[in-house]
Amino acid sequence: MEVKDLKVSIAPQEVLELVWQQINNAISAQFLDKYIQETEQGVVAMGLFEKYYMRSSNRATLTVLATDFDGVTRVHLAAGGGGQGAIFRFDWGAGEDFVELAEDALRQYMLE
């Protein structure tokens, strides 16, 4: 499992759109689900993506959670499910690659 936290200068909904544009270039990618909740405190946007990785002979998932409760959009990226076997969950770098795809999509908007 690979996890990364970022701060970006765009709205949570835009985060999901940009990540999907980046991931959609892969033939085996899917946008499985999206949930957006707008409140008085801010916006929560969650996206669930899936992609097949030949190196691990498995599908990996990427969960993207973006919030803007304090005036800055915070993004949490978590990839998993790409491992082989019941005991060892070694994914041959698929999770890291999936998180990096999302990070690349947001790079020009990153803060700090």
Give residue ranges: language-model regions:
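A generic alpha-helix structural signal
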Residues: L16-W20, V64, E103
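Ser/Thr-rich, low-complexity intrinsically disordered terminal regions
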Residues: W20-L62
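Well-ordered alpha/beta subsegment
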Residues: E96-E112
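Beta-strand/loop substructures that line and gate deep hydrophobic ligand-binding cavities in soluble
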Residues: S56-F90
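N-terminal intrinsically disordered, cationic/polar leader segments
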Residues: N25, I36-Q37, D68, R107-E112
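Terminal, regulation- and interaction-focused segments at domain boundaries
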Residues: M1-I27, F31
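N-terminal catalytic or cofactor-binding beta/alpha core of small enzyme domains
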Residues: E2, P12, Q22-I23, G42-V44, ...
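Conserved active-site and cofactor/substrate-binding residues in soluble primary-metabolism enzymes
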Residues: I10, E14, R59, G93, ...
